Amino acid sequence: MSKNLELWSSVEETDPRFTTKVNQRGGFTAIGAQYQFREATAKFGPFGIGWGVKDEHFTRYEDTGLVLYQSILWYKHYDNTGEVPIHSSIKYCLIGGRVDDDFAKKVATDALTKGLSKLGFNADVFMGLFDDNKYVNAMKQKFNGGEDTSIDWKKLVRAEMEGLDISNTVLVDS
């Protein structure tokens, strides 16, 4: 493996448990942002020490209801500090002129996850490999031995409502 691809290759595979199939805009696989942040922390160290963002700017465009977020994703890799410019935009003004209270968090998170993808994080999803069920099944096998470890939340809530002791119970989707 090329030294240039070392970082990419170490973070390109995605655990399917932290993805969601989305059936909007032609369909795509969404990756949980917290999962990406955990993986970045595992690779670089704690946020703010081994990686983070700096020079954050939010620019609102009143005529369109959009906000543009721009910043720099920085990370420590060996003895170097790398920097990647990141950006994203989002509508902050909802129907009826109401402001989305979470617009800043949403746009900053979107930009950061896109920035991590430039370093190779979850590249298998962005390269379309999650469209292939055989590939996804191989990743399930790799990350959790092929066992379905997803929780059936309906069973969990029902058991709690019935007062059952669920401390030693495995509740998986059926």
List each language-model region with its residue ranges.
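Interfaces that engage single-stranded nucleic acids at replication/repair/recombination sites
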Residues: 3, 136-174
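Membrane-interacting alpha-helical segments
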Residues: 5-11, 116, 147-149
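Short secondary-structure junctions and interdomain/linker hinges
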Residues: 18, 47, 164-168
